Structures are given as structure tokens and as C-alpha cells.
Amino acid sequence: MRQDQKKVEVVFSPEMYRHFENHQANVVIVDILRATSAICTAFMNGVSQVIPVPTLEEAQSYKQKGYMVAAERDGRVMDFADFGNSPFNFTKERIQGKQVAYSTTNGTRAVHMARNSKMVVIASFLNLTAVYDLLSKKDEDVLIMCAGWKGKFSLEDTLFSGALVEKLLAGGGFYTICDSI
């Protein structure tokens, strides 16, 4: 570890976040199968804004204000929602130029938990290089939070976290004290 290096850590479940929480760190949210991949897809398809909201009540209030809403719980699309949380729902024809409020079982909850961090970054395999480039230019430590499934470990989120950590460590600007990385 050099003086100019930044620390990178991985939180394998939101349930463990309180043990790692660091308001001066940049927190990377990872929910590979749904939330973060869907948000990346939405921006690739021209959405003007995605607002991650932790509760269904909040999502419904955005619906009443005229926003499109993508919302699910336990994999079921909510009755009031325009569509669910699959990246395949975020097509250019559906969302280009629109504002979307987005609420999911796991991913948007993780975003909400990290809201007081220095910066919250949404990451998936779709934007891995862009996330690496962004974090490499920042001076803060990085905490990668796997959204998991209902507070439990998620293999796909962990796989992505490993890929990002590998890039960060190989770039030379980061170190880790964690023996599981």
C-alpha cells in the first residue's frame, strides 16, 4: 500500500452495510440481474432520468405526478406500474426522453441505504469500464455493495464485484485489506 492509494472493499449483502458504511467513500451499487443492469440499459436507450425509490408508496406518488413507473416486489410487477424491473422492459420506444421512477426488491433499497455517501454509482457489466474510469479519477475510497436477494448473498453480484476490484487493483491506484478479494 502506498500513501496515494485508495482502499476498495466489498459488502456482500446490504445487511452488512452498517459495518462498512463510510460517508467519505464512493459507493458502487451492484444488482446485476435486475436493477443496475436495467438502469444502465435505460440510459443507453435515452431515458432522461431514473429515480430509484425504496418504497412502493413513493413509486405510486411519482406515478400520480405523471412519471413512468417501473416497480416490482419479489419478482412480481406491481399493478400500478407501467412495467417491471427487467432490463428488457427499458426499450428505446418505451422510455426515450422519459422520466422513470424505479422501485425494486433489492437494488433500489441498496441505493437508498448508500444515499449519504460521497457519491453513489450504479454498476453492471454494461458499464464496467466507465465505472472503473470514473472511480480511478476520484480521490475517495470505494465500497462496492452487492444488492443480493432479500439480504442474502448473490453470486452474480459478487462476480461483478470481483471483476471491478480486479480492474481497480490492476490499475495501481487502489489497495484492499480484505483477504476475500
PLM features per residue range, with description:
Residues M1-K6:
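N- or domain-start disorder-to-order transition segments that initiate the globular core
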Residues V8-E9, A25-V28, S48-I51, G66-A70, ...:
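Structural motif
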Residues A147-D157:
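Phosphate/ribose-phosphate-bearing ligand recognition and processing surfaces
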Residues P52-L56:
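A short glycine-rich beta-strand->turn/loop micro-motif centered on a GG-aromatic cluster
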Residues V10-E21, A35-M44, E57-V100, T104, ...:
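Residues that scaffold, gate, or flank divalent-cation-dependent active/transport sites
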Residues N26-A38:
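Active/ligand-binding-proximal structured segments within catalytic/core domains
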Residues T104-T105, S124, C146-G148:
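Short, structured patches in soluble enzyme cores that scaffold and shape functional sites
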Residues D82-M119, D133, K138, L155-I181:
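Long, charged alpha-helical interface segments
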